[in-house]
Amino acid sequence: MRPLTDEETKKLFDKLAQYIGANTTHLLERKGEEEHVFRLHKNRIWYMPLRLAKLASCVSKTNLMGIGVLFAKVTHNGNVRIQVTALEYIAQYSLFKIWVKPNQEQKFLYGGNVSRTGLGRITESTPKYQKVAVFSMGDIPLGFGVAAQSTLECRKCEMNSQVLFHEADVGEYLRDEARMT
C-alpha cells in the first residue's frame, strides 16, 4: 500500500470533480473528524482515516486484501474508474442529482437507462452529459450516471426518450460480488 503519485492524484480528483465539483476538498478535510487519505493497493484506490493507513503499513502486501472504502480502480491504461462503493460519498457531496420514480428503480438497479417516464426530479440547471448521483424518491442513493439531457430539455422531451445513462448502481454488489473485492 502506498500513497498516490501526483499523476494518480490528479486523475482521481479530476474524475471525482465531474461528480462532486469543488467538494473534493471535503473528502480530505472533514470537519470534526480525523484526517482521511487515499492509498493505492493492487491497482485499487482506497479511502481511509490516516490512523488506519498507518496501522495497515505493518501488514504485508500479500496478506492485505483491502482497507477502508474502495473508491476507484486504476485500469491497465492508467485511467481511473470510480466504483459504486464510493456512492456514499458521491451522493453526499454531489452537485447534480436525479431522483427516479419507483416504477423505474428496478430497471436502473439492473443496469438500464432511465427514460423520461421514470424521472421524478432533477437538480436545476443540470447540463447535458453531466455526471449525476441517482436517488430514489425517498432520497436513498441508488447509483450514479450521466444526464442524457439538460434540465430544460428534460421538461420538453418526449416521455420515452432517455434522460439518464447508467454508470453504476447498488445492484452491482449482488451482480458483480466477486469483482468488487
Language-model segment annotations:
Residues 1-181:
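Accessory RNA 3′-end/elbow-binding domains used by RNA modification enzymes
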